[in-house]
């Protein structure tokens, strides 16, 4: 029993040759624990909580909150979401980190996470997106490149390739369900596959310095592609996005959630409401939440046909 416990705990403790995976898993778990400690729901956090903690959401991400493309990869929608993602991460991490090393593992998680967030913003910027799955798909994409281009021992390659393809295929098909951000999965997978090819090419050089140089050049190239794409998205935001941001910054969102707006409108004392020609005063009537799961954004969707989901 003691051996089993120690074996399980070893997945979360960095050691030589296995550093990045446990650290990244620990960060994801720690963020979730801090969220819970601050009052966020353990099984189904509210939309407002996710946005406050850094979920990816086009009207906010593309109008100043660029950091959401990073933070969204460490935030999860409940304990089950975290558990499933960390299990998948642990599986690929055990296999992949031995091949590419800790530095590349760290960079891969962050880079493919950025690319998955950007592709999600491009495909449906109104979707509230969180979770490590975009980065995890990126890591599976890297491993897939290694399998296809023969960097894995032949006797292991077929079984691993079958396993990875089943995992990726199942999750992409399952991701067609409503409420799952398949665009992030695809963006992560494609960017990971390209990054994996770059790493494979780098390993064709015998000298470690040459391998490292190829890797870094490739990583910088992918980051530049992300940066260029993100700048284009920011430059071409729909007209509604800046208005939604005003709603967010004015405190109207929390007012709706807390059932305060109707009272504030009656008293006409809320400066943020009166200061701008905001969306709520023009399009959304007075509103009181009807349940714990009822949020300003879900009501906003019903009232104005603006799609908000995660």
Language model: regions and residue ranges:
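C-terminal transmembrane module of polytopic alpha-helical membrane proteins
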Residues: 1-14, 173-296, 300-304
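Membrane-water interface of alpha-helical transmembrane segments
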Residues: 11-25, 103, 157-161, 212-216
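N-terminal TM1-TM2 helical hairpin plus the immediately adjacent luminal interfacial "cap"
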Residues: 20-132, 180
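Alpha-helical membrane-inserting segments
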Residues: 34, 115, 119, 123, ...
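Alpha-helical transmembrane segments that form the membrane-embedded catalytic/substrate-binding core
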Residues: 82-91, 130-142, 181-200
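Alpha-helical transmembrane bundle and helix-membrane interface signal
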Residues: 98-102, 146-161, 200-213
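Cytoplasmic-side transmembrane-helix entry/capping segments in multi-pass membrane proteins
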Residues: 105-108, 132-136, 157-162
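Membrane-embedded catalytic cores of phosphoryl/pyrophosphoryl-handling enzymes
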Residues: 151-170, 174-182
């Amino acid at each position: 029993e003691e051996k089993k416990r120690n074996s399980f705990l070893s997945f979360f403790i960095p050691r030589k040759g296995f550093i990045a995976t446990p650290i990244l898993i620990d960060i994801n778990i720690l963020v979730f624990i801090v969220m819970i400690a601050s009052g966020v729901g353990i099984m189904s956090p509210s939309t407002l909580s996710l946005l406050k903690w850094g979920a990816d959401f086009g009207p906010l991400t593309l109008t100043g909150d660029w950091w959401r493309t990073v933070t969204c990869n460490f935030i999860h929608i409940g304990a089950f979401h975290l558990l499933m993602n960390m299990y998948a991460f642990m599986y690929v991490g055990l296999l992949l980190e031995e091949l590419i090393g800790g530095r590349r593992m760290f960079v891969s998680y962050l880079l493919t996470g950025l690319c998955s967030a950007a592709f999600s913003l491009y495909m449906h910027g109104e979707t509230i997106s969180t979770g490590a799955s975009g980065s995890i798909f990126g890591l599976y994409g890297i491993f897939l490149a290694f399998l296809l281009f023969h960097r894995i021992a032949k006797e292991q390659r077929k079984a691993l390739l079958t396993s990875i393809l089943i995992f990726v295929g199942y999750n992409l098909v399952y991701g067609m369900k409503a409420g799952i951000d398949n665009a992030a999965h695809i963006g992560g997978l494609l960017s990971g596959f390209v990054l994996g090819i770059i790493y494979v090419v780098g390993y064709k050089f015998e000298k470690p310095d040459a391998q490292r140089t190829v890797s870094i050049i490739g990583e910088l190239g992918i980051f530049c592609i992300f940066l260029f794409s993100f700048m284009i998205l920011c430059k071409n935001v729909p007209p509604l996005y800046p208005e939604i941001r005003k709603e967010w910054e004015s405190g109207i969102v929390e007012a709706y959630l807390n059932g305060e707006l109707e009272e504030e409108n009656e008293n006409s004392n809320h400066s943020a409401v009166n200061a701008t020609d905001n969306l709520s005063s023009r399009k959304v009537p007075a509103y009181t939440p009807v349940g714990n799961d009822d949020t300003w954004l879900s009501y906003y969707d019903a009232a104005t046909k603006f799609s908000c989901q995660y």
